Amino acid sequence: IDHHQMKERTQASRWVDVRPEYGASASILFEYLQSQEVKIATKLATILFYAIKSETEDLGRDWTKSDRDAYLKLMPLCNNRILHEITRPKSSRIYFKYFNAGLKNAKIYGNALIFTLYDIDNPEIVAEIADFLMRVEGIEIVVGLGHCHGEGVLSMRTSHLETHAGSLMQEIIKGLGTGGGHSMTAGGQVHLESTDQAALVALEAELVSRLLQALGLDLVEPEPLVP
């Protein structure tokens, strides 16, 4: 069960339910529970609600009527204290180290912002920082890169109506790895033959070059996010 594009290895599964048009896999799970008239306990409702809330940014991006229906039906079943603890968790100092690196390395090319984290221990941090940097004034697309356990990790966010993040991710990562996503969000992975700094820098340069060419920004001089 997933809401991302079908992967090659997924096609070999005996049973598959993949709906790329949905904003969250939790919405699909909710429909299964509803169809079987399963009573949804408070903790499960809270978990499913948070999944939809975070994936769609409170129905602000990549949502469907099914996502909205699940969101609205689950909301009154939630435990607000647990939900608050999930949405406002305590974070280790290393978490803020990654944010610091992202801000320092971020470069602006017109309406696009690109940042690199290099070595990370959790691939989700790339997406979190990409979400955060979408708040920069004048920025319509953010792409983040990192290296985690032998793989290059990419995350893309966009508010530009004419840019489909999933299609753009597939274009820039073609021949290097796998990727895809939705209209406003996308992710990708690149298997790294070498993890030394020079290889990571070379990969970053290639991906940035492809992205800027695809966006028509290859002649734009970059400027740092933080002067």
Enumerate the predicted regions with their spans.
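Short alpha-helices
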Residues: 4-71, 208
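Hydrophobic helix-and-loop "lid/oligomerization" segment in the mid-to-C-terminal part
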Residues: 54-227
